[in-house]
UniProtKB/Swiss-Prot annotation:
Protein name, UniProt field: L-threonine 3-dehydrogenase
Cofactor dependency: Zn(2+)
A Pfam family this chain is assigned to: ADH_N
Organism: Alteromonas mediterranea (strain DSM 17117 / CIP 110805 / LMG 28347 / Deep ecotype)
Recorded name of the encoding gene: tdh
Active-site residues per Swiss-Prot or TrEMBL entry: T40 (charge relay system), H43 (charge relay system)
Subunit organization: Homotetramer.
Enzyme class name: oxidoreductase
Manner of cofactor binding, per the entry note: Binds 2 Zn(2+) ions per subunit.
InterPro entries the record matches: ADH-like_C (IPR013149), ADH-like_N (IPR013154), ADH_Zn_CS (IPR002328), GroES-like_sf (IPR011032), L-Threonine_3-DHase (IPR004627), NAD(P)-bd_dom_sf (IPR036291), PKS_ER (IPR020843), Zn_alcohol_dh (IPR050129)
Keywords: Cytoplasm, Metal-binding, NAD, Oxidoreductase, Zinc
Cellular component annotations (GO), alphabetically ordered: cytoplasm
Lineage, uppermost ranks: Bacteria, Pseudomonadati, Pseudomonadota, Gammaproteobacteria, Alteromonadales
Binding-site residues, Zn(2+) 2: C93, C96, C99, C107
Purpose: Catalyzes the NAD(+)-dependent oxidation of L-threonine to 2-amino-3-ketobutyrate.
Keyword Electron transport set for record: no
């Protein structure tokens, strides 16, 4: 089958023919329709330090997808051939304390689809049926293909009550932009998004941000004054992994504020812990999606009128995958879709 493979321990990705995966007793065989390129895929493409320490070569990459069930193991229940599905890319063990307690997203033995097991950038994917999620008929293939990063946005944004709150989002990557759309949709008051990428900030504005701030040109405090904010932000969503952005967030939080952190900072980050202690801030780390509460929330948000369509800015045939990776790497895109049909 046609697959995108990290075939060499160097920059790049290669379209190759690989064997069709075998289906286990509890697995689904999914024929891929569309996939989306993730920031993780760009790390793997660029072969950075994280990738060199994490990715087995060769491996089929990719974990954002939608497809159709075309086969299943004999023990599978609840699915039928022809079902349209996406799926949770974190494959969990089922036997650790968190898994047995129902906190599956906190499994310490998690494997990643397209990271350390074969991924979705292929004509066919096999995953445990437990990890698959049926896509409602009124949600398009394009939107279904980005459920994985949309789930990161939903998990982060809905970690704390947002109704009537002022929300600061640092980092206008696709996940930060989708988080802004979610926050506004569920009733946040002011949703302010910071970054230094004008293209992405304009996209955030289209997706519902009250105000976008290019912090290389504007002062966040001036924007807060402009919005009539006298007490700081109630909720912070740190999506950038940039230390100076996190420090600025701590500085601008109201007393009793809550921060959800999805962005991954460098190993050593200096933090003024006095801001955390004396303001009584709560900081929560976010990894992936809650299984499967986040998935049901994603479907419900879209069915209740949340419009994510502007975040998908480019679509390429899989044969033009290089254009897709170049576009994603340019910083002048939202989500980039690869069409396998």
């Amino acid at each position: 089958m046609k697959s995108l493979v990290k075939a060499k321990a160097e920059k790049g990705i290669w379209l190759q023919d690989t064997p069709k995966p075998e289906v286990g007793h509890n697995d689904l065989l999914i024929k891929i329709r569309k996939t989306a390129i993730c920031g993780t895929d760009m790390h793997i493409y660029n072969w950075d330090e994280w990738s060199q320490n994490t990715i087995p070569v060769p491996v089929v990459v990719g974990h954002e997808y939608v497809g159709e069930v075309v086969g299943m193991g004999q023990e599978v229940k609840g699915f039928e051939v022809g079902d349209r599905v996406s799926g949770e890319g974190h494959i969990t063990c089922g036997h650790c304390r968190n898994c047995r307690a129902g906190r599956v997203h906190l499994c310490r033995n998690t494997e990643g689809v397209g990271v350390n097991r074969p991924g979705a950038f292929a004509e066919y994917l096999v995953i445990p049926a437990f990890n698959a999620f049926k896509i409602p008929d009124n949600i398009s293939d394009d939107l279904a293909s980005i459920f994985d990063p949309f789930g990161n946005a939903v998990h982060t944004a809905l970690s704390f009550d947002l109704v009537g709150e002022d929300v600061l989002i640092t980092g206008a990557g696709p996940i930060g932009i989708m988080a802004a759309a979610v926050a506004k949709h569920v009733g946040a008051r002011h949703v302010v998004v910071t970054d230094i990428n004008p293209y992405r900030l304009e996209l955030a504005k289209k997706m519902g941000a009250t105000r976008t701030v290019d912090v290389s040109k504007e002062n966040l405090q001036d924007v807060m004054d402009e919005l009539g904010m006298s007490e700081g932000f109630d909720v912070g969503l740190e999506m950038s992994g940039v230390p100076v952005a996190f420090r600025d967030m701590l500085n601008k939080m109201n007393h009793g504020g809550k921060i959800a952190m999805l962005g991954i900072p460098p190993q050593d980050v200096a933090v003024d812990w006095n801001q955390v202690i004396f303001k009584g801030l709560v900081i929560k780390g976010i990894y992936g999606r809650e299984m499967f509460e986040t998935w049901y929330k994603m479907a419900s948000l879209l069915q209740s009128g949340l419009d994510l369509s502007p975040i998908i800015t480019h679509t390429f045939s899989i044969d033009d995958f290089q254009k897709g990776f170049d576009t994603m790497g340019s910083g002048h895109s939202g989500k980039v879709i690869l069409d396998w049909q």
